[in-house]
Each structure stands twice: as structure tokens, then as C-alpha cells.
């Protein structure tokens, strides 16, 4: 039995070596990434097993993703190699036009990952897991990928969802709102991961306490409310925990939220309280933003403990 299953599209990332407009960048670093893959790595590094249900192309990038994922301890037995399409890629423009922020340019339309479908879901495998995770990204990339998430959520004992609304992937923000709210209304979500921007789209509020009240009315049990450079708040049973962000040099913030989410969810599943899980999630996201690459610095449980005990800002 696997502890956690994530559904989504793994991607190859080309991260600009220097900040600035992509038209002036000559050198890039290649990384394996993708929101759900990043989430899985955080889960594994906190001592739970995790499987990624996905598709990659029958190409060198697809092989790279499978080999890298396996090396990180992810169960890759449910990553399907699709002979009809290609592995998606994206480029990161760092520090321009907003310092310490990154912009993503995707080349993924029609990719193998977007061809994820309900037929890729092994029903018994999903039923026997403890929790199924996905994101608004997977809900956005294609109708069949959305249906795969719905099928997995139907079978799941427990669910977590990261709203992760990427406007470039949706036909409209209204469509994003309609789709994600339909999921929240239909399924009990054990842990919802979101932020003020997404909550403004979904509920037309940004205040964390008001957001928790409204999400709770929709059946959300635990809310992880990310505040970027201001830290994050977690809620459960009307108990609220806040953890401020650490001040560190920001190389690339991409992937920080995935590291926080995977760390928080995995520790919560192990019976840790929201304060402990949140502190470790903040530690993970802090380390990730200091380098290029989404998941290489996602810490193990032990390294996060050391960070929390020794690092002061």
C-alpha cells in the first residue's frame, strides 16, 4: 500500500542562468519539476511513500523524469510512457520585471502529461492509498486530466487539493472558479492549500479568517493558507497557527509552495499538529527559494529540524 498518490504533469524546466528577459538569456539549467512531482518529493523526504500517476512522452525528457523521480524515491510504476505525444517543458524568467519573482513560459499544449485520462487510474491502487493529491493545474490542462482527478477523488479515502490557479492554463478565470468550486462542493477535502489570489477568484474574499470560514462551509477540514513573503497560516477545527517567513536571499520562488504543501500534508498524515506541520512547511519553502530548481533543496525531516533549531533571522 502506498501512503500518498499525486496526479499531475511532470515537466522539464529550463531555468534562466541569469535574471532578466528571456530574449537576453543564453544559458539555462535543466531541472525535473512539475507541481505534483515536487509535492511527491516532499512527501518522500518526510518518510511517507508516494506515487505519481502521470504520462510522459517516449523521449529523452520523459526518460529523465522517470529516472529522476525513481532516484528520489517516488513510485514511478504508474507513470505511463505515451508514444503519441511529447514531454512538456517550460522556461523560467527570473527577476524581471519584478525582482525576486519569476515568470513561467510553458510549451505543454497537447503534451503527454495533458493526455492523462481516467483509464490511467488503477482503482484498487487508489482505494488502498491513504490520500490522493492533485492541483488546479491538472484540472486546467485538459478535460480528460480533470476527469482523471475526479475518478481518483471518487475512489480516495482522503484528499488534498492545491488550488494553484495559473491563468495562462485556463480559458478564463470564471472557468477556473467553476471547476475548482465544483470539486470542493462534491468531495470532502482533508487539506486545502491555497492563497489570497486564488481565494479572491474562488470566494471573492482575501481575509484568511473569512476564507477559512467559507472553505469550512464547503467541507474543507484543514486549510493551509500561503502568504508568500509573509509566511502562512494553517487552520483546523477553528484552531489557527501562523508562521512567519524567514528572510533569505531569493534565487527563484518557483516550487516553494509545492514543498510547503507536500511537507505539511505528509506530517499531518503522520499525526503531527498543524503548528508542527506548518513550521516544517515554512522551512521547506525557505530552502527551495534560495536556489534554481524546484525540489533539489526540499529538506528531509531531519534537515528541516536542524534548520528550525539553528537558523535565525
Curated annotation (Swiss-Prot):
Catalytic reaction list: 2-dehydro-3-deoxy-D-gluconate + ATP = 2-dehydro-3-deoxy-6-phospho-D-gluconate + ADP + H(+); 2-dehydro-3-deoxy-D-galactonate + ATP = 2-dehydro-3-deoxy-6-phospho-D-galactonate + ADP + H(+)
Biophysicochemical property: pH dependence: Optimum pH is between 7 and 8.
A Gene Ontology biological process term: phosphorylation
Enzyme Commission number: 2.7.1.178
Positions of substrate binding: 34-38, 90, 106-108, 166, 258, 294
Task of the protein: Involved in the degradation of glucose and galactose via the semi-phosphorylative Entner-Doudoroff pathway. Catalyzes the phosphorylation of 2-keto-3-deoxygluconate (KDG) and 2-keto-3-deoxygalactonate (KDGal) to produce 2-keto-3-deoxy-6-phosphogluconate (KDPG) and 2-keto-3-deoxy-6-phosphogalactonate (KDPGal), respectively.
Family indicated by similarity: Belongs to the carbohydrate kinase PfkB family.
Assembly mode: Homohexamer; trimer of dimers.
Record-given protein name: 2-dehydro-3-deoxygluconokinase/2-dehydro-3-deoxygalactonokinase
Lineage, highest ranks first: Archaea, Thermoproteota, Thermoprotei, Sulfolobales, Sulfolobaceae
Gene designation: kdgK
